[in-house]
Amino acid sequence: GTEYYKLAAGKAKEVIDGVENHIYNYALLDEYSQVYSWEYNNKNKELLLGIYYNRDQTNQAAPLTDFLQDMAQGGWGDTNGEIKFWKAFPEGPRKDATYFPKIILSDGELHDWWYDTDPPSREVVAPVFMKTVEGAVRGTEFDYTNPALVNAAGEKTLQLIRLSQVYCWYAEATGRSGEVNTKAIEVLNKVRNRADGQETNFYKETMTPEALAEAAYDEHGWEIAGYYWGGIASRARDMFRMYRYKDHFEYRKENPLIKVAEGIERNEAVPVTGTWDDSKMYAPYPYEDAILNPNLK
């Protein structure tokens, strides 16, 4: 309800005030390309909560999860971007740093993600996220033009909460509380200006509370797109909170073709079937627990 959004806005405002009053030593990085870079891996000043790794001691397993299996660098194909979301994603430095600009397949050539052979042979044709990747040589930036195999043992910091997310949460919670204020517009524009790579100041104080809330909801989704390792507050959690899985389920069942380039249309390789019920929003209880306690349903 509205009262909880007011509490959320108040808590986010505490963080924002702490940053602005130099109580907390956090700030947005200047460029979005720096956020998930190796250069700022251990000195990301907008990271409020992270899990740090050194693969000489303990590694994480993220580097190969987003590569498609037919990519030259050696991928696991655990994830891929959704075409509709990619299409709606505003152009600019944020989008450029979120997705592979080009992908290298087994032929050693650079291709747009929507490339396929004639006749079609690729199992998955989809946008590819580029946030968890690490350089083929340890301690270097990832180069998407380099076909060298990437080590599966990663040591990039897993970023759970960033300051830009707090800005989005404050703006959304303010809007869902039925309000619009100068600070909410200001911090949301900080996020969008960096994403655009210029001072667009896209959002105005003339917005309605509903428009502000939806804008902040969208900005948060774009800000953390493809980064499911930040599971505390992924885009999926936003969709769950707003009860938007059902509509998206129905859209994915339709699976329409989407224009991705001149004369080229693509749709999702993974079909969605069946009839919606709210149980689809939840993971099932582990079998071992369910057989011990029949009340778990």
Spans of features found by a protein language model:
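Short coil/turn linking the two alpha-helices of tandem helical-hairpin repeats
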Residues: G1, R176-E179
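Hydrophobic alpha-helical scaffolding
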Residues: G1-Y5, F85
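Elongated scaffold/linker segments in the mid-to-C-terminal portions of large proteins
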Residues: G10-Y167, R176, F240-K297
